[in-house]
Amino acid sequence: MRRPTLSAAIAATVIGLSSLSASAGVIEDRKANFKANNASMRAIGAALSAEDFETVTSEAQKIAAWAMVMPDYFPEGSGEGTSAKPAIWSDFIGFKDAAEANYHAAEDLIAAARKQDAGQAGEALRALGATCKACHQKFKSW
């Protein structure tokens, strides 16, 4: 009779540890993606100054790709010890909407860069930055 109880306890411990490990992995992955996103924003600024629209396009594509999957990197319970505000999970639809706004802003930048219109691309970059800032204000602790 004790054997199934012990087995159940061991299974629960293993499952709990694997969840903890998965959570730690997703946190590290999302931090790496946010750092890459920040590097892309800096690269876009420099490329735009040089009217290097190919780089603007490729870096904005990276941002758009990250925005599409960003919410997947915030599973329930992955906020402990991070700068992620609880609002991410209490307003997950709003968080997903913010990621979608970021995606659309990146797509607008891609469209402007493909036209090789520096003025329009500059406006699109500012709009993209505004989506980052809005999300950070609502969902990130500083």
Where are these regions (language model features)?
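Bacterial N-terminal signal peptides that target proteins for export
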Residues: 1-10
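Hydrophobic alpha-helical segments, especially transmembrane helices
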Residues: 3-4, 31, 137
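Compositionally biased non-globular segments, especially hydrophobic aliphatic-rich helices
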Residues: 11-16, 102
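N-terminal signal peptide c-region/cleavage motif recognized by signal peptidases
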Residues: 16-23
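Processing junctions and N-termini across compartments
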Residues: 18, 126-129
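Extracytoplasmic c-type cytochrome modules immediately beyond a signal peptide or single-pass transmembrane anchor
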Residues: 24-127
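The canonical Cys-X-X-Cys-His
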Residues: 128-140
